[in-house]
Each structure stands twice: as structure tokens, then as C-alpha cells.
Amino acid sequence: WSKPYQEAGYDVRIITLPEYDVRTYIPPENVYGILAAPPCTEFSLLNCKAEPRKRDEVAGMEIVNACMRIINQCNPHFWALENPRGHLRKYLGMPKLNFQPWFYGDPWTKATDIWGNFNIPKRKFENWADVPTLDLYIRPNRDKPNFAYLHKSAWSKIPQLQFHKPETDAEFRAMTPP
């Protein structure tokens, strides 16, 4: 989701493991904007029966708090922190924006929250029927693909995700378009 800023000439820095750890990152001066997308693993609403595990919201909040520390330290003109709709609302309150990717042209559902100080983008689509589609799996008795139920094999069908080939289904489902 930083790609439009990079294409517009901004100095974009991707702060993610293994190159950088947001918990220890020291930002440069004069940061104009921040886009943060902490891992959703600890905050997801999905009940993954195939891989039962206890959520560690404390560990998840370490990353969120590190993002917020950087945002507060930099005091940028705009900032946005993105995560799929889930338990993060317990800690950050209601988001400024909740949307479905198909509102903006990505042909799937994945309820997403964004907190921050930013201009809410105008929706490109009001009706699902108007969204250009891809050949993606649709669960029985549903009318739209749900990103949470797609497998990594769907990666090859999604042009906007070609920047990185995921090794696992979980890695695929955690991807944020550039």
C-alpha cells in the first residue's frame, strides 16, 4: 500500500523483518507519513481449527506499541495503522475506516480496519457486480471470494501480489498489497 507514494517520488522505507525490527527502529527526521501494518496473527477473529493455538495479544501489542511510538515520535502529516477487523479494536478503539478490499477494486472480501490521521479515500465501487473479478475460490453458499479462505495457490492469480511469493497459507493471507 506504499507503492503509490513511492511512485509519486516519496522516500519510502519498508520497515519489516528480517532487515528491520520495528521494536528497535529509530526513524529519520522529517517523516512525512507513516503506513503501519502490524501482523494480524494475534488479533484475528478467525478460529483456525486446522492449527489451534493460543493467541498472544501481549506479543502482538509489542509490535502495535512500537508502531505507535514511531508515529508519536515522528508526528507525521498523516499516519495509518492497518489490520483486519479483529481483536485490535479492544486496544485501539473503533477505527477511522472499516472497508472491504472490493470497495477499491481488489476482487475479494477481507474486512479491514484502519486507525489514524488520514483522508478517507473515495470508494471506487459501490456494488460488487461492478468489480472486475479474478478466478478465485468462492466458498459454497457465498457470492464473493474471501481472502481469509484462499490458499497460497491463489497467489499466481492475483497480479497486485506478485511482489512476493508466499511460502505458507498464513503468509499469503497476511500479505498487504504494495
Describe each PLM feature range:
Residues 1-178:
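Conserved active-site and SAM-binding loop architecture
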